[in-house]
UniProtKB/Swiss-Prot annotation:
PANTHER family, per database record: LEUCINE-RICH REPEAT RECEPTOR PROTEIN KINASE EMS1-LIKE-RELATED, LEUCINE-RICH REPEAT-CONTAINING N-TERMINAL PLANT-TYPE DOMAIN-CONTAINING PROTEIN
Protein's UniProt name: Receptor-like protein 6
Residues in the signal sequence: 1-25
Segments passing through the bilayer: 947-967
Pfam families listed in its UniProt record: LRR_1, LRR_8, LRRNT_2
Organism: Arabidopsis thaliana (Mouse-ear cress)
Coiled-coil stretches: none
LRR repeat extents: 122-146, 148-171, 174-199, 205-228, 230-253, 254-278, 280-301, 302-325, 326-349, 350-373, 375-397, 398-421, 423-445, 446-471, 477-497, 498-520, 521-544, 546-569, 571-595, 597-613, 614-637, 639-663, 665-687, 689-710, 711-737, 739-762, 803-827, 828-851, 852-875, 877-900
Length: 994
């Protein structure tokens, strides 16, 4: 028995020993095989030496937001005497020791990636990540196509440029491809061969799960073949300049979890009827031309966590079927055309943290359905039509950090419970009708508040002490414009927030410069406009180191305290001093200023040559001062950057200098109301961005500038009250009209000749309907608009902003002859037509009846005959008509707009009559009875008529003499008031101002 036990024991020990030996050998062999092959190591070391180490300042995403990316040089760990399989960013195959993975993302690499790079000797690579480096705009080498085992390729945000080689599409094993960058449409962006690349991509990459080509210039439509990429789980095509209509079927790919089509403004499409069991988690269609409604089938997206459809053209109501999206955390529908009320079913979205429906046409009261969503951190309902009161129970949203209800019609007071939400960092209630300041004193409870916007409401009942905001130590932005403020308790020693960057106190009844501002070292923008501040601008203002935007307009300031040396060396880029009482010579603004507005002051002297030292001015407005002398020729140096030059209403003389050769961005030039002479400079023909040209009320002596019709954006042309001469029709060449002109005022010059019947055929902008409310020269920054003075309805009218819908043709006060062109009838969007004080003949064209938007028609002081076309009686928009002093005959049209006019609108036309004229003008235009036709000859009739006239004159002499003596007595004995009360009619009088 003992022998058997010993034999068994020996047998077991032998087996254990053999197993242990085998395990050790396998482990040793494995360790040996993990070692990096020398050729792999050498290739990597050569690759390391191809680049310099570069430490980036950061990376921006496509929206310009700084990304949370940390970079460090991974290749620093690569040394010749170590195993490359253990280097940072390297993965090796456990059996062969070949390099299969290379992750050098965020590795501070700087230099060109050349086609002969040693990288391409690593033939066994399955994953390559070179994201967040700087390959200095080198093309993506086609040699990547040699990596036939490659499954993942990430070259994002690494400064590649040029055409993407179609050879990359040979990598048919790819499951993830990221070629994105942060700068769409830039010269250095990547691009593809259109349209072949996308077709082959869809056909070759059937296994692809993730595709990101953001900021790659695709500039074509997405082919229907993308719908067959059933393995896709993530598709990101931001900022690719996608065109055409996006295939709905792509949104229905069964396994698709995330799709983003943001920043493709020309991409059209609509949301499909979503199927059940859809896998979508994130749907982002932002800044596109997608339209249509949100379908009720949105409820089938049971797993959706983020829905972003902002800045597109979606419309209709927000569907109540959103209630089914129980996992939704982000809902962004801003900047669309949604209407109606927010559905109560929104209250079911218990996971919602972000809710943004700003810039739509929503209405109703504050959406109470939001008050039950206690996870909400962000609410933006700005720029809608909400009314009523803000809810008193808003404090239920205890996690709220951002709340903005700006630009609505909320009334009443700010709910006191709002000040219990201690997590609030942003509170925006500007541009409403809030009128009760009672609860504003509780604002001090919001210790975390960084942005407070209460401006432009109706807070006028009582003053608010500015010191209630002293406790808000984290404030960065404070806007209180329109709130009457008391600053008596605020001194330079008051401990206001030291973080303040933006301060808006316009229209706050402030009478002196707030002293606390002098300690705001981080302040970059200040608005003290529309107050009653008198005296001088304190010198300490210019010493604020970060100050860049200053608006002091519409006060009573007369000058500056102390030297302006600090101003000239400041960072200020926008300075608005308009509508004050500044006097003396014009000072030199900071060289880096971009917006300098000094209009409506008393600046005198010459425009100093030093103004030509400005680096890149965009807007220069010195209008309505007392400047004289010449316009400096050295301004030519500024024309490459100037967008607006306004020198209106000064005493400038000489000629308008020929300085516009490089004025490629000049959109508005106004030198009206000076004493300029000579001709218009020919260099204006190169101002391809010019929208407004106003040279009114000068002494310019020139012919009509036909060459201006080559300007592609010219919309306003005012040559009024100069010495222009010649014809308005280019008889010596082809006349193309002015396709974009909306306002043309060439009145009170010396234009002659006739206008052909097709004269207005190419005035396209006044022929087509304009539906969108826009302003000509609508600014992107600082709210600067060009104003204009025009004649309308017989009076001078100033427009502070020029609407694109407002259209004018004013040829009055010239010597134009012939017929009014029949083509005037195609100008269906024309609002004002003034052809008065010329020598037009012929008839009033019946085509005027097509001008259904016409408000003012003046053809007085001409030689026009015939009848007023009865069709004009249908022009319901016509408010003011003047056909006086012509040779018109017949009845006036039947229409209330003709019956409302003063008698002066018809005088000087003894041949016109009408039933309504008797009420307006008395018996002089009473309806004429039908005259019987006598059988004798016309000659005898004429002689008889002459005889009857003499008899009537004699018979009327005696009673007429009596009547005249009686009237003389009445008027000279101060009884004319009795006479007018008894027999006369008081009439309104149009006042002409200029």
């Amino acid at each position: 028995m003992t022998g058997l036990y010993s034999s068994m024991s020996f047998f077991l020990r032998t087996i254990v020993l053999l197993f242990s030996t085998s395990s050790f050998c396998n482990t040793f062999a494995s360790l040996t095989q993990d070692s990096c092959h020398p050729d792999q190591r050498d290739a990597l070391l050569e690759f390391k030496n191809e680049f310099k180490i570069w430490y980036p300042n950061g990376f921006l995403d496509i929206d310009g937001v700084l990304m949370d990316v940390t970079s460090y040089p991974k290749t620093k760990s690569w040394t010749k005497n170590s195993d490359c399989c253990y280097w940072d960013g390297i993965t090796c195959d456990t059996k062969s020791g070949k390099v299969t993975g290379l992750d050098l993302s965020c590795s501070c690499l700087h230099g060109r990636l050349e086609p002969n790079s040693s990288l391409f000797r690593l033939q066994h690579l399955q994953s390559v990540n070179l994201a967040y480096n700087n390959f200095t705009n080198s093309p993506i080498p086609a040699e990547f196509s040699k990596f036939m085992r490659l499954e993942r390729l990430n070259l994002s945000r690494s400064s590649f440029s040029g055409h993407i080689s179609i050879k990359l599409l040979q990598l048919t094993n790819l499951v993830s491809l990221d070629l994105s960058s942060s700068f769409p449409y830039s010269p250095s962006s990547l691009s593809i061969e259109k349209p072949l690349f996308l077709h082959l991509l869809a056909l070759n990459f059937m296994n692809l799960r993730e595709l990101d080509m953001s900021s790659v210039d695709i500039s074509s439509a997405i082919p229907i073949e993308f719908s067959y990429m059933w393995s896709l789980r993530s598709l990101t095509l931001k900022g690719c300049n996608l065109l055409g209509r996006f295939p709905n079927s792509v949104l229905l790919i069964p396994n698709l979890e995330s799709i983003s089509l943001d920043h493709n403004l020309n991409l059209e499409g609509s949301l499909p009827n979503f199927l059940r069991n859809n896998s979508l988690l994130k749907l982002s269609i932002y800044n596109t031309s997608f339209s249509g409604t949100i379908p009720n089938s949105i409820s089938n997206l049971k797993h959706l966590t983020s829905l972003k459809l902002q800045q597109s053209a979606f419309s209709g109501r927000i569907p109540s079927s959103l209630r089914s999206l129980s996992h939704l955390s982000n809902l962004v529908l801003s900047e669309n055309n949604f209407v109606g009320e927010i559905p109560s079913s929104v209250s079911n979205l218990k996971q919602l943290t972000l809710f943004d429906v700003s810039d739509n046409n929503l209405n109703g009261n504050f959406p109470s359905s939001l008050l039950n969503l206690n996870q909400l951190r962000y609410i933006d309902i700005c720029s809608n039509h909400f009314t009523g009161f803000l809810p008193p129970t808003i404090s239920q949203l205890s996690n709220l950090e951002f709340f903005s209800a700006c630009d609505n019609s909320f009334t009443g007071s700010i709910p006191s419970s709002l000040f219990n939400i201690s997590s609030l960092t942003t509170l925006g209630l500007s541009y409403n009708q809030l009128n009760d300041t009672t609860n504003i004193k509780n604002i001090s409870l919001l210790h975390n508040l960084q942005r407070l916007l209460l401006d432009n409401n109706n807070f006028k009942a009582s003053q608010v002490d500015l010191d209630v905001f002293l406790s808000l130590k984290r404030l960065v932005s404070l806007a209180l414009s329109g709130i009457p403020l008391s600053t008596t308790n605020i001194t330079s020693d008051s401990e206001f927030s030291s973080h303040l960057e933006y301060l808006e106190l316009s229209g706050c009844n402030i009478i002196e410069f707030p002293e606390f501002i002098r300690n705001q070292r981080n302040l970059s923008s200040i608005d003290l406009s529309n107050n009653n501040i008198k005296g001088q601008v304190p010198n300490w203002l210019w010493r604020l180191p970060e100050l860049s935007t200053v608006d002091l307009s519409n006060n009573s300031l007369i000058g500056f305290n102390g030297s302006l040396k600090a101003l000239s060396g400041s960072k200020i880029v926008m300075l608005d001093l308009s509508s004050n009482a500044f006097q003396g010579p014009l000072f030199m603004p900071p060289r880096g200023i971009q917006y300098f507005l000094g209009s409506y002051n008393n600046f005198t002297g010459y425009i100093p040559p030093s103004i030509c030292g400005l680096a890149n001015p965009l807007i220069l407005d010195l209008s309505n001062n007392n400047l004289h002398g010449l316009i400096p020729r050295c301004l030519e140096a500024q024309m490459s950057s100037l967008s607006v030059l306004n020198l209106r209403n000064n005493s400038l003389d000489g000629s308008l200098p020929n300085i516009f050769m490089n004025a490629k961005v000049l959109s508005s030039l106004d030198v009206s109301h000076n004493t300029l002479e000579g001709k218009l400079p020919a260099s204006l023909a190169g101002c391809s961005a010019l929208e407004i040209l106003n040279v009114e009320s000068n002494n310019i002596n020139d012919t009509f500038p036909f060459w201006l019709n080559s300007l592609p954006k010219l919309q306003v042309l005012v040559l009024r009250s100069n010495n222009f001469r010649g014809t308005l029709h280019n008889v010596d060449g082809v006349w193309f009209g002015f396709p974009l002109l909306r306002i043309t005022d060439v009145s009170h010059n010396d234009f002659v000749g006739t206008l052909p019947s097709d004269y207005f055929m190419n005035w396209t902008a006044i022929s087509k309907s304009e539906t969108e409310l826009q302003y000509i020269g609508d600014p992107e920054d600082y709210g600067y608009y060009t104003s204009l003075v025009l004649m309308n309805k017989g009076v001078s009218m100033e427009m502070q902003r020029i609407l694109t819908k407002y259209t004018v043709i004013d040829f009055a006060g010239n010597k134009i002859q012939g017929k009014i062109p029949e083509s005037v009838g195609i100008l269906k969007e024309l609002h004002v037509l003034n052809l008065s004080s010329n020598a037009f003949t012929g008839h009033i064209p019946s085509s005027l009846a097509n001008l259904t938007n016409l408000e003012s028609l003046d053809i007085s002081q001409n030689k026009i005959g015939g009848e007023i076309p009865p069709e004009l009686g249908t022009l319901s928009s016509l408010e003011w008509i003047n056909v006086s002093h012509n040779q018109l005959v017949g009845s006036i049209p039947q229409g209330t707009q003709f019956h409302r006019q003063n008698c002066s609108s018809y005088e000087g036309n003894p041949g016109i009559y009408g039933s309504s004229l008797k009420d307006v003008c008395g018996d002089i235009h009473a309806p004429r009875p039908p005259q019987a036709v006598l059988p004798h000859s016309s000659s005898s009739s004429s002689e008889e008529d002459e005889l009857i006239s003499w008899i009537a004159a004699c018979l009327g002499f005696a009673p007429g003499m009596v009547f005249g003596l009686t009237m003389g007595y009445i008027m000279t004995s101060h009884k004319h008031e009795w006479f007018m009360d008894t027999f006369g009619r008081r009439k309104g009088r149009s006042t002409r101002t200029r």
